[in-house]
Amino acid sequence: MFPGVADLDLPYAAALDQMTELIAGTSPDQLSRPTPCAEWDVRALMNHVIGGLERFAAMAAGQSVDWSAEIPDALGHDPAARFQAGRTALEAAFGEHPENIERVRPTHLIETAVHGWDLAQATDRVGDLDPGVAEAALAAARERLTPEVRKRTTAFGQEVPIPASATPYERLASFLGREP
């Protein structure tokens, strides 16, 4: 059974802290590196993460979001500050609209955890990742990413087989249909 929203408080905060550190620690010379997301380099991945955070903040505030719309350049001159501003907006929206926490937080945890792994892979910082974040995200993904949901979206493939020795992040990536 999926953990309650209160059970996600610590891993969700840890995922956001982790992403803040990953973005802040990414140097300009790393922006053109490939990522596990074949269609994105580090710059495009960070743009997706920051722009996506702004969209999740809008959802948390009760606004409708067009997820199919292209994300404009969200990096700006200071990607870490832009991410922090989005996080502040998200937290404010949760404070003003607690009724949206259950709908938004688990999905954003999954997104933040898997893209944190992507960014860490691309910038050689996988050893810095908190396994508890991946474990909580995987629990949320197992609850939310049902076979019916997989049929309705192209964002996730079928689960990929992995060895029993896989790390929590590799298990999360494989469950989301990605080769770890």
Residue ranges and their predicted role:
Residues 45:
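Extended, alpha-helix-rich binding/interface surfaces that flank or overlap catalytic cores
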Residues 52:
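Short, surface-exposed acidic-centric catalytic microdomains
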Residues 49:
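Short, conserved "active-site rim" segments that organize catalytic pockets and cofactor/ligand binding
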Residues 2-8, 14-18, 25-38, 55-180:
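Structured surface interface patches that mediate subunit assembly and partner/cofactor docking
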